[in-house]
From Swiss-Prot:
Name of the protein: Hsp90 co-chaperone Cdc37-like 1
Segments for region (Required for interaction with STIP1): 277-335
Renumbered residue ranges of the record's region Self-association: 2-170
Location of Phosphoserine modifications: S32, S88
Biased composition (Low complexity): 27-40
Coiled-coil ranges per UniProt: 84-120
Function according to Swiss-Prot or TrEMBL: Co-chaperone that binds to numerous proteins and promotes their interaction with Hsp70 and Hsp90.
Species the sequence originates in: Mus musculus (Mouse)
Keyword annotations of the record: Chaperone, Coiled coil, Cytoplasm, Phosphoprotein
Lineage of source species: Eukaryota, Metazoa, Chordata, Craniata, Vertebrata
Region: Interaction with Hsp70, residue numbers: 266-335
UniProt-annotated stretches for the region Self-association and interaction with Hsp90: 147-276
Record has Flavoprotein as a keyword: no
Amino acid sequence: MEQPWPPPGPWSFPRTGGETEEESDLDVSPSSSHYSPVPDGGAQMYSHGIELACQKQKEFVKSSVACKWNLAEAQQKLGSLALHNSESLDQEHAKAQTAVSELRQREEEWRQKEEALVQRERMCLWNMDAISKDVFNKSFINQDKRKTEEEDKSQSFMQKYEQKIRHFGMLSRWDDSQRFLSDHPHLVCEETAKYLILWCFHLEAEQKGALMEQIAHQAVVMQFIMEMAKNCNVDPRGCFRLFFQKAKAEEEGYFEAFKNELEAFKSRVRLYAQSQSLQPVTVQNHVPHSGVGCIGSLESLPQNPDSLQCCTPAPLCSVDSVVHKEDDDRMMDTV
């Protein structure tokens, strides 16, 4: 029996006239010939699970920046103080050592917490009764029909700049990414990070692992920039150059934190896909769709980080038109 196909995500926004053939090959939006309709309940459950995974990823990156990057800052400061022998610096040296010890303890506490969460995900048996009840409670029948101004702004942004965000997601060089964000500073925002994260889950569900890894790199880049800005209490558009400066120099501590989080994120994406027992199926019925309202179905999902421990949804499926590796390579070459 054919399993329900995932609902439209941010990749389903209307395409511009200049879209290349390779880009359309990656499109499984409702307007695509690869699309298969899905019951409302299945769509809600899939979208809910992806949204929870997205929120969890934000929490992991927040911890990485708060602990690991601050630890690198403290170690760097401690190293600079060690170069001086003045007794007047003894007090500063002691304070720096204390800060390093505290940050190491926080890092270890978070590492244990992360391991426990991953283990729980591996052992979890999805409670379908709880899922069905949760989906019903959060269905469009019980939702407030009035959208907030913030939700409307986010939806409009992702729809307006989808092609630019996709372009950024395909960049692989630090200099290219920094130059692109310098030309498009408005893309340094939470909406861009969210789009890229959701795209990663979508690509892994489609068994496009190589392309998922490319997009994952850029997703974590944007998340680190946003969390750096929050941690320093500055506008992210004013600090993204600092991130690339440290990344290109591969500064000890900073770059290691980024690489570790990138690998952890890719593992979480794969783990989520495996936990759903994804099975490619043949889509026989192609139903054209205008794609109107796709954003709303995504943005209306719950945003409460406390609900991250909830069960995730029932199995989803893939299509038989999986893009070959050479198609992915051509896609990267066109950017």
